[in-house]
Amino acid sequence: MKILLATTNEGKVRELRQLLKDLDIEILSLKDMDKKLEVEEDKETFLENAIKKATSYAKFYKLPVIAEDSGLEVDALNGLPGIYSARFFDIEFGKEVLKEIPENLSKDEKNNLKLLRLLENQTNRKARYKTALVFYNFDYGIWTEGVCEGQIAYKPEGNQGFGYDPIFIPEGYNKTMAQLTPEEKNKISHRGKAVSKLVEILKKVL
């Protein structure tokens, strides 16, 4: 059975392939598809965005789809970046801290730098990663969610993972997500928890 992962994010594809390895399926990503479809993530929650992506890509490619929307919620910023996590650097909120930005930074590095600058004088650094995962195959849909609690570090550390991993310290750890091995991360991450729930359900229905 072929299942399409509705993402072009190589980090997400890599993690999802590893987490789904126990299922007897062939995994494709959007980069494997000849025809291209852009689905705007314009909903107000991770779950709504994931549902929109799953149904839109399934109808377009005529394939079962696994879609995800995830992000980082920081208490001191009233839940931001939240659904804007992937494009946090570009939104209007917090633009005042974006002076003297080094050139040639990646998108992830820009997002991390903006967040660290906004929290510069903040002692409350509590945060959490959240994800909503949706499987849709025309006959039915399944959704699961995962949360990983933690806090924001004072500087980036580590070179594993992607996104906010270099500045996110999971609860119970004294190092960032980017300092964990992929196996360690998958055991505790928001994505790992959501996929584990989904795999258990899919084993019964596929």
Swiss-Prot record:
This is dITP/XTP pyrophosphatase. Its EC number is 3.6.1.66. GO terms for biological process: nucleotide metabolic process; purine nucleoside triphosphate catabolic process. Keywords: Hydrolase, Magnesium, Metal-binding, Nucleotide metabolism, Nucleotide-binding. GO terms for molecular function: dITP diphosphatase activity; ITP diphosphatase activity; metal ion binding; nucleotide binding; ribonucleoside triphosphate phosphatase activity; XTP diphosphatase activity. The active site is at D69. Pyrophosphatase that catalyzes the hydrolysis of nucleoside triphosphates to their monophosphate derivatives, with a high preference for the non-canonical purine nucleotides XTP (xanthosine triphosphate), dITP (deoxyinosine triphosphate) and ITP. Seems to function as a house-cleaning enzyme that removes non-canonical purine nucleotides from the nucleotide pool, thus preventing their incorporation into DNA/RNA and avoiding chromosomal lesions. The keyword Hydrolase applies. Its cofactor is Mg(2+). InterPro entries: dITP/XTP_pyrophosphatase, ITPase-like_fam, RdgB/HAM1. It catalyses: XTP + H2O = XMP + diphosphate + H(+); dITP + H2O = dIMP + diphosphate + H(+); ITP + H2O = IMP + diphosphate + H(+). Homodimer. Transmembrane segments: none annotated. The keyword Ribosomal protein does not apply. Gene3D superfamilies: 3.90.950.10. GO terms for cellular component: cytosol. Pfam families: Ham1p_like (PF01725). Belongs to the HAM1 NTPase family. Substrate binds at T7, T8, N9, E10, G11, K12, S70, F162, G163, Y164, D165, K185, H190, R191. Binds 1 Mg(2+) ion per subunit. Mg(2+) binds at E40, D69.
